[in-house]
Amino acid sequence: MEKKKSKFKRVLLILFILILLLLVFDVVSTEIKSKKLPHHFASAEEGRELLLSNTEYYSDFSQNDIDYRLKRNGGTLDELLDATTDEIKDFNFFEKYLLDHNIAKMVTKLNKNGYKLPELKEETVYIKTDMKVEGVNAGYTHGTQIYLNSANILVGSIPGKASEYFEHLMWHELFHCLTRNDPDFRAEMYSLINFTVADHDFEMPPSVSAKYFHNPDVEHHNSYATYNIDGKDTDCFLVWICTEDYSENDPPNGFVTDVALVPIDGSDVYYTMDQASNFDEVMGRNTDYVIDPEECMADNFSAAMQYGIDGEEGKGYPDPEIIQGVIDIVKR
């Protein structure tokens, strides 16, 4: 009996060691493969320093930008930055593994399909934040900094739609880093939805600048498309606006946003999406996220990288030529 117990214990020990070795191998191989898309995970301290380095972005904030994020009237930029940096946390080992696993999966798809992305001048830096100040968004970027909602990192470990959503997010945020890094890549991508990139940013007229709501993923307003408005072709750039000031009395209904189509000729007027009869024709119908060509193409890029030309579950796309265009660009 004692011999049987001893043998059983040895078998359990061997199984435990084998499982442990497999886990170690998986973690190490996943990390090695994921490094094909160069990145690192910021500590909370580094993440806070990086966020505070984005002075140009935050210095242009309006009072409305501050109030909506702090969810109260009369806040200051310093208070906003304090609240935003307080949300930045350290990654734990499991979260790093989950992210490396997703990045390794992205690398596999790039290699399998023969896709080549523009090289980044700096590696991407992933930063973990609770994201409450930024409206509980899933993610956003500055430069090559990718800020991820701490709750969504765990969602990425759930098989099925949840993990697919997280993969989409990872591709989407990476796109913003790529377009900042490579102006030619950005121009090519924007051209797929009929946008031309100019050599300068367009000035927002007073009627628009007063309502402009900052999006960290959109660094420039220097691209335009031709919209048919009241039967006339008008070259416009897009601006995300908040049509109402923040109100503590009615916060849920206070955040009303719209997309302003602003003529590039400098006239102090803007139009809405509904006023452009060809808005869907210009932007395509593959995504509803059309507040800016940057966000629209980030979604198209994500779909192309994640599902290819066949689309999710082989269902295709309303405008497959945009997806094919993305594939052609990264396959050259």
Model-derived regions, located:
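N-terminal mature-domain "stem" immediately C-terminal to a signal peptide or N-terminal signal-anchor/transmembrane
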Residues: 32-100
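Extracellular low-complexity, Gly/Ser/Thr-rich intrinsically disordered linkers
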Residues: 268-309
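Active-site scaffold of zinc-dependent metalloenzymes
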Residues: 129-171, 180
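Auxiliary, metal-adjacent structural segments of Zn-dependent hydrolase domains
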Residues: 85-148
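Sec-dependent signal peptide cleavage junction
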Residues: 24-33
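Post-HExxH zinc-binding segment in Zn-dependent metallohydrolases
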Residues: 182-263, 294-332
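Soluble non-cytosolic domains of exported or imported proteins
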Residues: 93-104, 160-165, 169, 288-296
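N-terminal Sec-pathway targeting helices
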Residues: 2-17
